[in-house]
From Swiss-Prot:
Keyword ATP-binding: yes
HAMAP family: PPAT_bact
Biological classification of the source: Bacteria, Bacillati, Actinomycetota, Actinomycetes, Mycobacteriales
Protein name: Phosphopantetheine adenylyltransferase
Species of provenance: Mycobacterium sp. (strain KMS)
InterPro entries: Cyt_trans-like, PPAT, Rossmann-like_a/b/a_fold
EC number: 2.7.7.3
CC cofactor: Mg(2+)
Catalytic activity as recorded in UniProt: (R)-4'-phosphopantetheine + ATP + H(+) = 3'-dephospho-CoA + diphosphate
Site, as annotated: Transition state stabilizer: H17
An MF annotation (GO) of this entry: pantetheine-phosphate adenylyltransferase activity
Underlying gene: coaD
Function recorded in the entry: Reversibly transfers an adenylyl group from ATP to 4'-phosphopantetheine, yielding dephospho-CoA (dPCoA) and pyrophosphate.
Length: 158
């Protein structure tokens, strides 16, 4: 059985993320979305909120589950008996960074990284950009799953 991990902070999950998850789920028997904790970052959404939003947005994917983790991604991957990481790429800038990480993960732990090119319609979408635009009153409904947009708007209203 093949399995892969899609790691990230997902604060919040975007339609671009969901597209990558769907495509990974079509290639692997099992996919774990790893919502990672970075103690140096203060997110807009709590860990539990981020996990719930991903689970809601991906309920149509029976071979996908959501877990939290901290520390090295390769340790998270190997603890589950997997040997693959899936990362989405929006641009050549993403590729430069992710290639370096992929090579390190292979060197340190023998874990392979599979890159999935972002759909052109999502190549500009990021969680931070969606939050920034929403904070300034812009419409981000085309960037986020509906339930996530509702939560973001509620969070901004206080």
């Amino acid at each position: 059985m093949s399995g892969a991990v899609c790691p990230g902070s997902f604060d919040p999950v975007t339609l671009g993320h969901v597209d990558i998850f769907e495509r990974a789920a079509a290639q692997f028997d099992e996919v774990v979305v790893a919502v990672l904790v970075n103690p140096n970052k203060k997110g807009m959404f709590t860990l539990d909120e981020r996990m719930e939003m991903i689970a809601e947005s991906c309920a149509h994917l029976p071979n996908l589950r959501v877990e939290s983790g901290q520390g090295l991604v390769v340790d998270f991957v190997r603890a589950r008996g997997y040997s693959a990481i899936v990362k989405g790429l929006r641009s050549s800038t993403d590729f430069e960074y992710e290639l370096q990480m992929a090579q390190m993960n292979k060197h340190v732990a023998g874990v392979d990284t599979f890159f999935i090119a972002s759909a052109p319609s999502y190549s500009f979408v990021s969680s931070s950009l969606a939050k920034e635009v929403a904070t300034l009153g812009g419409d981000v409904s085309a960037l986020l799953p509906d339930a996530v947009n509702v939560r973001l708007q509620a969070k901004l209203r206080g």
